[in-house]
Amino acid sequence: MASASTQPAALSAEQAKVVLAEVIQAFSAPENAVRMDEARDNACNDMGKMLQFVLPVATQIQQEVIKAYGFSCDGEGVLKFARLVKSYEAQDPEIASLSGKLKALFLPPMTLPPHGPAAGGSVAAS
């Protein structure tokens, strides 16, 4: 019997939902919440620092969950899991929603620049 780490990780959409839910739940575990808060504090909403501090912690948290499902316990395993989830997002709104929730846990909110006349593009008449 081969070990889980040598088997390719192939999950159905239903299995992907279960794993996504487990990963999201792992972020709310007290020890992981503290690790993420510390990483966010160190990053100070700077995108470069987010990549330096937050992303590695988020990757480690995901690795701990997905290794039980046959993904390698490294960055490549997380990337493979992300690609698998992405492949199901268009077909399954629940997976798309869970994926969005997961990303929101470790990516800063993106603010779009304002558009149109209300954005200060026009000069007020006096």
Swiss-Prot record:
N-acetylalanine: residues bearing it: A2
Pfam families: P_C10 (PF14974)
GO cellular component, one term: cytoplasm
Sorted UniProt keywords: Acetylation, Cytoplasm, Disease variant, Intellectual disability
Tissue and organ distribution: Ubiquitously expressed, with higher expression in lung and fetal brain.
Taxonomy, superkingdom: Eukaryota
The keyword Acetylation appears for this protein: yes
Subcellular location(s) of the protein: Cytoplasm
Chief subcellular location: cytoplasm
Keyword Acetylation: yes
GO biological process assignments: camera-type eye morphogenesis; cognition; corpus callosum morphogenesis; post-embryonic development; psychomotor behavior; regulation of skeletal muscle contraction; third ventricle development
Reported disease: Temtamy syndrome: An autosomal recessive syndrome characterized by intellectual disability, variable craniofacial dysmorphism, ocular coloboma, seizures, and brain abnormalities, including abnormalities of the corpus callosum and thalamus.
Function: In brain, may be required for corpus callosum development.
PANTHER family from the UniProt entry: PROTEIN C10 (PTHR13463:SF3)
Family the entry assigns: Belongs to the UPF0456 family.
Protein name per Swiss-Prot or TrEMBL: Protein C10
Source lineage: Eukaryota, Metazoa, Chordata, Craniata, Vertebrata
Gene label: C12orf57
